[in-house]
Curated annotation (Swiss-Prot):
SUPFAM superfamilies: RL5-like
Cellular component GO terms, alphabetical: ribonucleoprotein complex; ribosome
Biological processes annotated in GO: translation
Protein name: Large ribosomal subunit protein uL5
Subunit (UniProt): Part of the 50S ribosomal subunit; part of the 5S rRNA/L5/L18/L25 subcomplex. Contacts the 5S rRNA and the P site tRNA. Forms a bridge to the 30S subunit in the 70S ribosome.
Keywords associated with the record: Ribonucleoprotein, Ribosomal protein, RNA-binding, rRNA-binding, tRNA-binding
Cross-referenced Pfam families: Ribosomal_L5, Ribosomal_L5_C
Family: Belongs to the universal ribosomal protein uL5 family.
Organism name: Rhizobium rhizogenes (strain K84 / ATCC BAA-868) (Agrobacterium radiobacter)
Function per UniProt: This is one of the proteins that bind and probably mediate the attachment of the 5S RNA into the large ribosomal subunit, where it forms part of the central protuberance. In the 70S ribosome it contacts protein S13 of the 30S subunit (bridge B1b), connecting the 2 subunits; this bridge is implicated in subunit movement. Contacts the P site tRNA; the 5S rRNA and some of its associated proteins might help stabilize positioning of ribosome-bound tRNAs.
């Protein structure tokens, strides 16, 4: 009996509709030139890690719940006396999502988390890096449905970087608009 493989909703939509729309808009010569999502990197910097070394572990547990994948604890590369940071001190957590988990996270981010952000007026359309990647920040991690608001003792912020295979910002912006990213006008 053949095993049925799960395919995320947004990936099905990309294959069925978004690729054709981008091909029509930019008229690529080759199908492999059509931009697609490469990876999503989520980073949590924990500023309070200098006072309490257990904070990055707590942040990593929350990040694991949000991403559905075990994060890596990040360490300081060098000492900074002004911030009371020593070399190799744990200062945050990060996770890189690819494949099905990436599409599932993107679905939750766009349809559930971003509408729950307080005073949200849309994403900044200038947050592209010039090479087709988009970066954004979220100030409170409780906007994700996986986090129980009653059990949270501290709010964490996070950086979310969406990496695409697009070569220009216009191509990446068109790709993310097709995925319903709410860019402000």
């Amino acid at each position: 009996m053949a095993e049925v493989k799960y395919e995320p909703r947004l990936k099905k939509e990309y294959v069925a509709r978004i690729r054709a729309a981008l091909q029509e808009k930019f008229s690529y010569a080759n199908e492999m030139q059509i931009p697609k999502l490469d990876k999503i990197v989520i980073n949590m910097g924990v500023g309070e890690a200098t006072a309490d070394s257990k904070k990055p572990t707590v942040a990593a547990a929350d990040l694991a719940a949000i991403a559905g994948q075990k994060p890596v604890i990040t360490h300081a590369r060098n000492s900074i006396a002004g911030f009371k940071v020593r070399e190799n001190m744990p200062i945050g957590a990060k996770v890189t999502l690819r494949g099905a988990r990436m599409y599932e996270f993107l679905d939750r981010l766009v349809n559930i988390a971003l509408p729950r952000v307080r005073d949200f007026r849309g994403l900044n359309p200038k947050s592209f890096d010039g090479r087709g990647n988009f970066a954004m920040g979220i100030k409170e991690h409780i906007v994700f449905p996986e986090i129980n608001y009653d059990k949270v003792d501290q709010m964490w912020g996070m950086d979310i970087i969406v990496c695409t295979t697009a070569t220009t910002d216009d191509e990446a912006r068109a790709l993310l608009k097709e995925f319903n990213f709410p860019f402000r006008q």
